[in-house]
Amino acid sequence: MEIKCILKCLIDSQTGTSQTTGNQWQSDEWLVVVPGPREKKMVFRVRGVERCQQWRNFFDGMPDKNVPVLIRFEIDAHENTQKPGQWFNTIEAWDISVTSW
């Protein structure tokens, strides 16, 4: 899936070490806005140390923070293991590029 929007800000970042592999991990949450008569907002996650750094570099390198971007992402539903029968969605982005309206 993809969305044209404005990348507003990094809202949360988590890091740690995998208990099984010992590798470092990172997960960032970003906020985007789709302008219009009824402005829409979406929060999504970017995973992986390298990918998170790429997104931060992309955002920091944008001279105009109101430039539209194209974000490609996946949505997936997961069942809550603590409460069977309850589900939640994850939105994970994997690509970003500057675009135009």
Where are these regions (language model features)?
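Single-stranded nucleic acid-binding surfaces, predominantly the OB-fold ssDNA-binding core
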Residues: 1-101
